[in-house]
């Protein structure tokens, strides 16, 4: 299987996706550990890092399931657990809508905690 061009393409996509996640997480973690004051921009940095990591993990695990086929859905497969974890990360607070709402409000100078949240 490793010599099949489609499998190689899928593996390359997975590797590049994972490589893109780490630098953002490392930067946010380092800034947090060093007490860097990003003010309200912390919302963008923290929510953005979580969102990108979860979306990237989902893409990688979904592609891995495509490559492995049906055997990846069984409990004995480590891909099954990774698939479940990655999928649940997408709905764990904050989900897609909430993440986008908070990031956009902060970027637009709107206090995300100020009522009303919508309207």
What do these predicted ranges mean?
Residues 1-18:
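Glycine-rich beta->alpha junctions and the first turn(s) of the following alpha-helix
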Residues 12-16, 44-49, 118-119:
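A ubiquitous short alpha-helical element
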Residues 14-25, 50-60, 86, 90-93:
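Alpha-helical transition-metal enzyme core signature, strongest for iron centers
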Residues 19-51, 65-73:
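C-terminal helix-coil-helix/basic helical segment that borders enzyme active sites and/or dimer interfaces
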Residues 60-66, 97-101:
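Short segments within alpha-helical structural elements
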Residues 71-119:
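Glycine-rich phosphate/cofactor-binding loops in nucleotide/flavin-utilizing enzymes
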């Amino acid at each position: 299987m490793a010599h099949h061009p489609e499998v190689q393409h899928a593996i390359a996509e997975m590797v590049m996706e994972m490589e893109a996640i780490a630098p953002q997480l490392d930067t946010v973690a380092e800034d947090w550990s060093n007490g860097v004051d990003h003010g309200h921009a912390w919302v963008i940095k923290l929510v953005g890092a979580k969102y990108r990591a979860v979306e990237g993990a989902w893409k990688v695990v979904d592609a891995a399931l495509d490559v492995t086929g049906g055997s990846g859905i069984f409990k004995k497969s480590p891909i099954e657990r990774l698939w479940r974890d990655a999928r649940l990360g997408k709905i764990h607070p904050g989900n897609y809508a909430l993440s986008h709402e908070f990031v956009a409000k902060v970027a637009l100078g709107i206090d995300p905690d100020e009522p009303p949240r919508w309207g």
